[in-house]
Amino acid sequence: MQQETKPNFWALTPLIVFLSIYLIASLIMGDFYKMPITVAFLVSSVVAVAISSGGKLHKRIDLFCKGAANSNIMLMVWIFILAGAFAQTAKAVGAVDATVNLALSVLPDSLLLAGMFIAACFISLSMGTSVGTIVALTPVAVGIAVQTGINTPFMVAIVVGGAMFGDNLSFISDTTIVATRTQGCNMKDKFKVNSLIVIPVAILVTIVYLFQGSEITTTPSATPIEWLKVIPYILVLITALAGVNVMIVLLLGILCSDIVGIITGSIQFWEWFAAMGSGISDMGELIIITLLAGGMLEMIRYNGGIAYIIQKLTTHVKSKKGAELSIAALVSFADLCTANNTIALIMSGPIAKDIARRFGVDPRKSASLLDTFSCFVQGIIPYGAQLLMAAGLASITPLAIMQYLYYPYLMGVAALLAICFRYPRKYSL
């Protein structure tokens, strides 16, 4: 599974097929909802198995299954299952409505958008995981959207943007740890360089949300705040911020929702089971997409698709700026092919370090570029865990969210400008 692979352009065919079917067909039809993403992945997965050099058909299928059953993929599936169960049980006991009422009563109308973005930034920065932040805040964001009339995909995109901010900067984020270790620099030094690039973007996005929020007016709710029903979300946030494993966090949230529901009389024991079952079923499509993507991307790796990208990106580098651009492109393509920014960093980090050493790129700058571009791509691809999770919890499509992802897009632009204009100067000369 992990042997050296020869660069092979044709190994990228499944990815090209997927993009062609899903994006081009949708653009031709003028409707992104007409092409189910599951069908696009099914076709591209069949192509991946058909063109693979893995030997007999049963061996190629076995290779595909091993990719789908990768430990990272299985962990994502477990999180999706628990997240679906928690979201539905919290909704059934009234925890979502109670939390939304609390947020609407505390935050002025004009601060709803900016407040949600800042909350997502702070939570993800504290807990070091974008997925955990999305799990915790998306149901609340959807509830606020429903009660205020705000566009639901827009509200969910705010949460995703804030979640990617923390994923990029947090000291305890997997991406920060891998980026600094592979480049050989301290976390605090990487944080300084990274902050100079992305914090101005976060401030700009917050200002944009403040202006957009100034037009929002809500009708004061006559419903009193049910503090007891807010407890499941408070527990989830506190345990997440304390660094508890996200699966334990979700299990505690599910149990707490049941206890609160029984105490308040809003749900019976068997209704709790039914709510969990419904929530898990709602994640079915998301899980199918994740498994198909995992298998397809493993076939691409096995047949040399990623090796081909790495070879092409590192062949013609001749300057420090070119080296930084190749590092950015390298990790971006790796993430595009793996849909996992941590894995993308592990794959591209050693190569990026070699490029940085040969052309005199500051390790702090290369670590920042690796982390930032991996989070940029991860935050916008429709088959990444973040958008899939957010879309699943909000019952919308990833494409519906993508058009409103202000922060991830601007983060990518800012990182590209930092390369082109040699910023920050101290770490670019």
Descriptions of predicted regions:
Residues 132-143, 160, 171-185, 341-355, ...:
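Re-entrant/interfacial helical elements at transmembrane boundaries that shape
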Residues 77-86, 107-140, 313-351, 370:
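Hydrophobic alpha-helical transmembrane segments of multi-pass integral membrane proteins
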Residues 4-7, 27-40, 67-71, 103-108, ...:
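Interfacial loop-to-helix junctions that mark the boundaries of transmembrane helices
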Residues 32, 161-164, 168-223, 228, ...:
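Juxtamembrane and boundary regions of transmembrane helices in multi-pass small-molecule transporters
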Residues 70-76, 101-118, 145-155, 199, ...:
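Membrane-interfacial loop-to-helix junctions in multi-pass transporters
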Residues 110-123, 149-166, 322-335, 359-380, ...:
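Alpha-helical transmembrane segments of multi-pass membrane proteins
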